[in-house]
Amino acid sequence: AIARPVPTDSIAPLFRRRSNPDAFERISRTVPGGFASIERDSTGRFVVRMVDTTKADTIRAALREPFTAGRSPVVKAGILRELATARAERVSWSMAQLIDWNDYVATFVIGGPAVVGVGVNVHRQRIEVDVADENGPDVVEARLGSRRIPCGLVVIKITGPVRLL
């Protein structure tokens, strides 16, 4: 069973939220431990990334349902075995926190010709703002400069203009 929502230092109350979060976002928002992601390492083993690794067992248990729903009994058993031994890795930001910061940042940078995209990179633990050209970083920095966003959380990448196909 999923625990009741955990109080966080979320900035979500500052702006309107998207609706219909996926299963992983729901786990991040409701299960203690600050779930960020689940990935495979270079050896193929599951790694569960979270803010508080002392809550690893709780997060692993919460991941069982979304990872096994609709799977055959044999596949389900294999996944459950792997989840039980998944390595816990500490990260700075939960998925929910990254999504909230992304939505907050987007409210200030979307809407001009300089910015072509904004998104969460959960693996790299950051918000990525894609800009059209070399003037874009200055525009983004001017829009975000007084917003008290944590240092290193936002990365600006020059990707070029959007091209319609």
Language-model segments: what does each one mean?
Residues 101-104:
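PDZ domains, with a preference for the canonical peptide-binding region formed by the helix
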Residues 108-109, 141-145, 153-165:
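Substrate-binding/charge-relay-adjacent region of secreted/lumenal peptidase catalytic domains
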Residues 14-21, 53, 134:
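Soluble non-cytosolic domains of exported or imported proteins
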Residues 1-19, 78-93:
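N-terminal presequence-like segments and adjacent domain-start helices
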Residues 29-98, 111-142:
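Short glycine/threonine-rich beta-strand-turn micro-motifs
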Residues 18-20, 24-31:
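Short, flexible domain-boundary/linker segments around small modular repeats
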Residues 2-4, 147, 158:
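Compositionally biased, intrinsically disordered/low-complexity regions enriched for serine, proline
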